[in-house]
Amino acid sequence: MKYIDEYRDGSLAKDVARQITALADPARSYHFMEFCGGHTHAISRYGLEDLLPANVRMIHGPGCPVCVLPIGRIDAAIALAMRPEITLCTYGDLMRVPGSNGSSLLKAKAAGADIRMVYSTLDALRIADAEPDREVVFFAIGFETTTPTTALALKAAIARGLGNFSIFCNHVLTPAPIQNILESPDVRKLGTIKIDGFIGPAHVSTVIGTEPYEFFAEEFRKPVVVAGFEPLDVIQAILMLVRQVNDGRHEVENQYIRAVTALGNEKAQAEVANFFELRESFEWRGLGEVPYGALRLRPQYAAYDAEKRFSMVTPAAKDNPACECGAILRGVKKPADCKLFGTVCTPDTPMGSCMVSPEGACAAHWAYGRFREKVRQVDARRAVA
């Protein structure tokens, strides 16, 4: 298949890996963060870390919108859904994200709440149109990739006069948390590790372009390479980052030239700007409060803002203290470092959002990485023996 098969050529990937090994300075280490959950899954699925030299390490970042959603927002959605007049529409990967005290949207649905899984914003609009007596709330979540579809849904609701449709907005932004990881004293207090460069997200960058990364590449002197999701995309991006570090450069480079431009999708950006504005601050799981890290509806659309329309309150809630999801999202730990992983925390019984979402680092390690981890442990024991 064009643009897929040729980017999964194992022999080419091994050739690029050999170039990385040849270029990587053995006297130093390289730590690169892949921000996006799609890259995390590609690295785990195709075993890319096994191709890299020991001094080139990948760090999982907070690029999973479901994973970074704080427990309080889940609790607020559950409380709203339990109201008899409410129909809450949500994507499937939010259904099992744990709230406080073992709650979840799935359990609330079993308890009688009208919660419906949808595949797009259009599904929620159709429900609002077909059931005018119900207050239909769409649980909007995602990075810049999915925000335009929410904007278009709101535009359609206004045009069709759907007064029973509203949005619980949890759209988050990409550049802000990267900057937060690099400069926030709160995040440093929680713990982070040295990062030499970033693999920039693919789908997000098709919307926002590469220009938004220029500021922190220059300000924090960290190279960024925007890359696609196929294994050759990712390993080529790692090669480009190694070259930049060796050269002392800190530029934004675009590996994903077949889909990403400098300016991105300006029409989509305009639709988003029409309906949304920046929040001064928004809590991210694992990072704390991130300034300008999320969006909300503009005041003129307050009638469609579920938080204002239904006087929603986001309660203060703490993560399971045994769950390392927050540390994993900051790049401090890997899934195998969590004592819950693979024991009480599995895809069937998730203790944290990193195991629930298909983009989560724990879900990726469960699906692809845990077996290689066991092989490494066996090899290490044999080497000692």
Swiss-Prot record:
Q: Where does Fe cation bind?
A: 36, 64, 67
Q: Which domain of life is it from?
A: Bacteria
What Gene3D superfamilies does this protein's entry cite? 6.10.20.100, HypD, alpha/beta domain 2
> Which biological pathway?
Protein modification; [NiFe] hydrogenase maturation
The answer to whether the entry has keyword Metal-binding is yes
> Which BP terms from GO are recorded?
protein maturation
| Cofactor(s) named in the record | [4Fe-4S] cluster
InterPro entries per UniProt: Hyd_form_HypD, HypD_1, HypD_2_sf
Record's keyword terms, sorted = 4Fe-4S, Iron, Iron-sulfur, Metal-binding
User: Does this UniProt record's set of keywords contain Protease?
Assistant: no
Q: Which family does it belong to?
A: Belongs to the HypD family.
Q: Indicate what this protein is called per its UniProt record.
A: Hydrogenase maturation factor HypD
Gene encoding the protein: hypD
